[in-house]
A protein has these predicted regions:
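A glycine/threonine-rich phosphate-anchoring loop and its flanking beta-alpha core
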Residues: 1-72, 163-167, 171
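Gly/Pro-rich interdomain helix-loop hinge
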Residues: 135-202
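Glycine-rich phosphate/pyrophosphate-binding beta-alpha loops
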Residues: 4, 109-141
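Short glycine/threonine-rich catalytic loop with a Thr-x-Gly-x-Asp
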Residues: 49-53, 73, 77, 114, ...
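Residues on a specific face of well-ordered alpha-helices
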Residues: 7-9, 51, 55, 59, ...
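A general structural signal for well-ordered alpha-helical packing
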Residues: 81, 100, 104-107, 122, ...
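Glycine-rich phosphate/diphosphate-binding loops and the adjacent beta-loop-alpha structural elements
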Residues: 63-116, 127-130
Length: 203
């Protein structure tokens, strides 16, 4: 795939009919076999790589805070982010076999994570921007991404998770090599800027 969707390891499919998204889920949709071929990614347009790559990062992050997450999904998501956080920008600025391979693996791991935990609000709110305004999926997911995470962090006391959400955020901060939610938000904004994923809807 485009090193972003993780579709090769998920039980989900999406069809748009008259601009309306229809989702399907079945174990029968998981392929029996798949191939990760990073050579195909190197020459892809940067706009596609930027959007798809951010989608992989978003999937892993959303998986970590999902109410449906478990130990296995956390392991997949953490491994994904350890790779993608360090490879995403270089994959866009100077694509080569090494960083293309890393993003392929990161995407695959993120797909495995969300197949267990599913995604959360950033994905749920992205679909109208794609169907109505033709904003690519990963770009649409990123539009308000850090705002959703800040809201969750600022409302830890209202968490309905079966796990300690504060500890999950501590894990996220560690994976992004930041100290707090402000630094995390700044790093996400910086990554989007470097990837030329515009936040301004007017543009």
């Amino acid at each position: 795939t485009t090193a972003g969707s993780g579709a090769e390891v998920t039980s989900n499919a999406v069809i748009y009919v008259d601009g309306i998204k229809h989702s399907f889920e079945s174990e029968l949709l998981i392929p029996d076999n798949f191939f990760l071929i990073p050579e195909f990614l190197i020459s892809a347009p940067n706009k596609i790589k930027a959007s798809a790559g951010f989608d992989a990062i978003a999937q892993a992050l959303e998986s970590l805070v999902s109410k449906k997450s478990n130990d296995q999904s956390v392991e997949f998501a953490s491994k994904s982010l350890r790779v993608s956080v360090n490879s995403y920008i270089s994959f866009l600025k100077d694509p080569n076999l090494k960083n293309a391979t890393e993003m392929s693996i990161a995407s695959n791991l993120a797909g495995k994570a969300i197949n267990i935990s599913k995604t959360t609000a950033p994905h749920a709110t992205s679909y109208p921007f794609t169907s109505l305004f033709n904003i690519s999926h990963g770009h649409a997911v990123g539009l308000f991404f850090e705002s959703f995470f800040r809201f969750n962090f600022d409302n830890l006391n209202r968490s309905e998770t079966s796990f300690d959400l504060k500890k999950r955020f501590d894990l996220i901060f560690d994976l992004f090599d930041v100290r707090n939610i402000d630094d995390f938000s700044s790093k996400i904004k910086f990554m989007k800027k470097q990837a030329e994923l515009e936040d301004n809807l007017i543009k």
